């Protein structure tokens, strides 16, 4: 992937960048692997806003991704690398030898014509999926399961990867992108390699409208709201917070509060917290 830089023909184009989509080999998705999806604009079934700053955006079809990678001992050919509007990573279209088609996250270096497979004794190469206990220490992995058979939940964004550190009894030690070292059951599966489209984080949207296409609405500061909308609101002109410390929109302390429940069941599986945490 390379970054495409635009000429500053307008204010919106100035500093704007995008992907050149050089890796994309097919523009129309596989119809049998599509599902319709409806957007709720951050509302629940009562119509109340539960997630702020969402709404609008371009209509999209959901691509059904195979996160489980449980089709063992059956080789698949990479037929295409496609764009997926629902995620930052690109996706790869697989054709299995038994006629089944599936999408997977496209790892860095995967090309059309490559062979990928899943199982306990497959080669350690990008795109292959196997249990953590069969992956050598130091290997970069992505799409990691937390429960055997549930499907990959960790490390799925563009450019992300984790590293296998070693085995500790029934668990495998994995260093995540954040720096956190965590125990994961050795029977859980992961995919070899780094997630592709690694320069996605360098893209600059350039204008507000491009953000709206993604379904993201503007975010206002609490200090410019009315007092019935936010604890920081109200006052004459640029008024201070008016409280001992900043508050969330729902009246809770915004700083100094732990963001993770210390009684969470998975707490004992975390060997070292992420970088910057206390």
From Swiss-Prot:
The gene is rplB. The keyword RNA-binding applies. Belongs to the universal ribosomal protein uL2 family. Gene3D superfamilies: 2.30.30.30, Nucleic acid-binding proteins, Ribosomal protein L2, domain 3. HAMAP family: Ribosomal_uL2_B. PANTHER family: LARGE RIBOSOMAL SUBUNIT PROTEIN UL2M, RIBOSOMAL PROTEIN L2. This is Large ribosomal subunit protein uL2. GO terms for cellular component: large ribosomal subunit. InterPro entries: NA-bd_OB-fold (IPR012340), Rib_uL2_dom2 (IPR014722), Ribosomal_uL2 (IPR002171), Ribosomal_uL2_bac/org-type (IPR005880), Ribosomal_uL2_C (IPR022669), Ribosomal_uL2_CS (IPR022671), Ribosomal_uL2_dom3 (IPR014726), Ribosomal_uL2_RNA-bd_dom (IPR022666). It comes from Lactobacillus helveticus (strain DPC 4571). GO terms for molecular function: rRNA binding; structural constituent of ribosome; transferase activity. Keywords: Ribonucleoprotein, Ribosomal protein, RNA-binding, rRNA-binding. The keyword rRNA-binding applies.
